[in-house]
């Protein structure tokens, strides 16, 4: 029916993706060999959103795995669900991008991109009615950011009317893996603003905080972080995969969340998050879920929604619950915290309800918010970018791959424009508009 083709690129993307397929396979009752061992017809009814049925009743993920070095893919292949993927869908080079966006976008990545696109076409052709693509990648490295954005722009050319959803891990404020992260991230955002439809912004630091504070894990691993991300990824598409009372799909989400085409960077959250010890002491109710869902500590990227205002938001509930109660709770949030919502978009929270909760929970909720506070994150990256670019530090790595300084300047100003657009709508109020119109008439 409404298929989604999943693409994961680079080390970060492949690790998130691997975790995501564990979660989705588990939800649909698929074991690591691709065989169905579920207990409900609902698991199979729309399994083809993410899986292809192959010969002998095997289910194969519609996933494309790409990287410029074989390392991460080998570990995916030898991981718990490594044997479920179609072997031809592993596309990798041998050189690596060395955290260099230019290598991923212009040199090494460009050599590999055609073989990736062949696999993309093959997957898209086997779809009955393709809904869109979802891409997992990070913006700080070389492959996920450089080659990831190259692939997104190529897919955009070939499938202009399909949704393009990304799960992008941005560099964290305090934890840095690479010195050139600000360069790679800025060049990537420059691409994502133009070519993606919806970007779910994630960052490791916010995810670590959730693991420490909420889940009370003393030594969180990347596996724990990726598990959080995959909970959100599964929540976003659950309406496509399971029956529900109020459905949402990628396009409905976009229509409800994006008031202006460039402002499509979202904060995401998932509830309930409880530490293992205190799980059994919590009753799960719609008000409880709603409360945790809107909590700033619950956001998976390091921007504080209380520093901005929500343009729009979307809540995707899962489980048996009354839609009336969901609507009441959502209205309640908007009425009590009206200063955090822009008043010139009335009823700007969309909710949907899917009947089937995730494994092991009675009910859950996924939150997607389009908040002007996300500019904090862009601002932070932009400041680090400018600090280095002013001195032209590390630039030779990029110009050596044939890039021009001009491209850096363009990316920088595009990012700064984005920040000021968010600021402009944060400050806008319903009344102001009238005054301007009046002045124009007089003139």
Curated annotation (Swiss-Prot):
Region ranges (Disordered): 424-443
Location of this chain's protein in the cell: Cytoplasm, Cytoskeleton
One Gene Ontology cellular component: cytoplasm
Pfam families: Tubulin (PF00091), Tubulin_C (PF03953)
GO process annotations (BP): microtubule-based process
Annotated Acidic residues bias: 429-443
MF annotations from Gene Ontology: GTP binding; GTPase activity; metal ion binding; structural constituent of cytoskeleton
Residues given in the record as Mg(2+) binding sites: 69
Cofactor(s) required for function per UniProt: Mg(2+)
UniProt keyword annotations, A-Z: Cytoplasm, Cytoskeleton, GTP-binding, Magnesium, Metal-binding, Microtubule, Nucleotide-binding
Binding positions (GTP): 11, 69, 138, 142-144, 204, 226
Function in brief: Tubulin is the major constituent of microtubules, a cylinder consisting of laterally associated linear protofilaments composed of alpha- and beta-tubulin heterodimers. Microtubules grow by the addition of GTP-tubulin dimers to the microtubule end, where a stabilizing cap forms. Below the cap, tubulin dimers are in GDP-bound state, owing to GTPase activity of alpha-tubulin.
Subunit structure: Dimer of alpha and beta chains. A typical microtubule is a hollow water-filled tube with an outer diameter of 25 nm and an inner diameter of 15 nM. Alpha-beta heterodimers associate head-to-tail to form protofilaments running lengthwise along the microtubule wall with the beta-tubulin subunit facing the microtubule plus end conferring a structural polarity. Microtubules usually have 13 protofilaments but different protofilament numbers can be found in some organisms and specialized cells.
Family, per entry: Belongs to the tubulin family.
Extra remark: The 2 beta-tubulin genes of Chlamydomonas (beta-1 and beta-2) encode the same protein.
Protein name: Tubulin beta-1/beta-2 chain
Lineage: Eukaryota, Viridiplantae, Chlorophyta, core chlorophytes, Chlorophyceae
């Amino acid at each position: 029916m409404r298929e989604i083709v999943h693409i994961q690129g680079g080390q970060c993307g492949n690790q998130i993706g691997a975790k995501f397929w564990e979660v989705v396979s588990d939800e649909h009752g698929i074991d690591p060999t691709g065989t169905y061992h579920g207990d409900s017809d609902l698991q199979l009814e729309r399994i083809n959103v993410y899986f292809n049925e192959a010969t002998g009743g095997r289910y194969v993920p519609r996933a494309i795995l790409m990287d410029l070095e074989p390392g991460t893919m080998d570990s995916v292949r030898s991981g718990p669900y490594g044997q479920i993927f179609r072997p031809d869908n592993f596309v990798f080079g041998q050189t690596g991008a060395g955290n260099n966006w230019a290598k991923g976008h212009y040199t090494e990545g460009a050599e590999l991109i055609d073989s990736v696109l062949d696999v993309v076409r093959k997957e898209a052709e086997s779809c009955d009615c393709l809904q869109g693509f979802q891409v997992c990648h990070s913006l700080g490295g070389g492959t996920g950011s450089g080659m990831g954005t190259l692939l997104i722009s190529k897919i955009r050319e070939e499938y202009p009317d399909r949704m393009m959803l990304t799960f992008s891990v941005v560099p964290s404020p305090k934890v840095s893996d690479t010195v050139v992260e600000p360069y790679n991230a800025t060049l990537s955002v420059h691409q994502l603003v133009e070519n993606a439809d919806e970007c779910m912004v994630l960052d490791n630091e916010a995810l670590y905080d959730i693991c420490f504070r909420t889940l009370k894990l003393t030594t969180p691993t990347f596996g724990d972080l990726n598990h959080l991300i995959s909970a959100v990824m599964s929540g976003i598409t659950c309406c496509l995969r399971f029956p529900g009372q109020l459905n949402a799909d990628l396009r409905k989400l976009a229509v409800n969340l994006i008031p202006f085409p460039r402002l499509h960077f979202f904060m995401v959250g998932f509830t309930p998050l409880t530490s293992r010890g205190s799980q059994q002491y919590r009753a799960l109710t719609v008000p409880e879920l709603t409360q945790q869902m809107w909590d700033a500590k619950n956001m998976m990227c390091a921007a504080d929604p209380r520093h901005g205002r929500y343009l729009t938001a979307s809540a995707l509930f899962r489980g048996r619950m009354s839609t009336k109660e969901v609507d009441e709770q959502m209205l309640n949030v908007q009425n009590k915290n009206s200063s955090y919502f822009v008043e010139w978009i009335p009823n700007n929270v969309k909710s949907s309800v899917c009947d089937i909760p995730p494994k092991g929970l009675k009910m859950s909720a996924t939150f997607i918010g389009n908040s002007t506070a996300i500019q904090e994150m862009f601002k932070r990256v932009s400041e680090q970018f400018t600090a280095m670019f002013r001195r032209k530090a590390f630039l030779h790595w990029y110009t050596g791959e044939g890039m021009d300084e001009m491209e850096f300047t363009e990316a920088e100003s595009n990012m700064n424009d984005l920040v000021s657009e968010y600021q402009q709508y944060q400050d806008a109020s319903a009344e102001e508009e009238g005054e301007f119109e009046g002045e124009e008439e007089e003139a």
